Amino acid sequence: MPSVDTASAILSSLDALGVTHVLYCPGSRSAPFAYALEAGSFGGDARPILDERGAGFAAVGLARTGALPASVVTSGTAVAELAPAVLEASHARLPLLVLSADRPGELRGVGASQATDQSGFFGTHVRASIDLEPQE
């Protein structure tokens, strides 16, 4: 399953870069991250959180303690639920990494279910926004 391999590679990279916590919000688009976490692709603390807003603010709290957290959410409106936490982290100059499992680019803007263009969604409140295309 290529998407699980990609999620594993991303999580392993986060681990190597010093990310300490992954707060995972379950969803069908982000399921490969759940499988990769279960397989041990991330060596830090990983925990499921059902509400994206809760995950965002839990990540902000962890960042305030000196941790380097990441929140993983699914597609559609889930990323919008992180906006208050992203703005809080931005204003407080706290590290917060957001991974959103969006639909492929060709499904955006054509009426596909749960396809919200997430690239650049947080505007100037983030240091970078990267859109990875799916791998074959």
Regions found by a protein language model. Give the residues of each.
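N-terminal alpha/beta PP-like core and its mobile active-site loop of ThDP/TPP-dependent enzymes
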Residues: 2-136
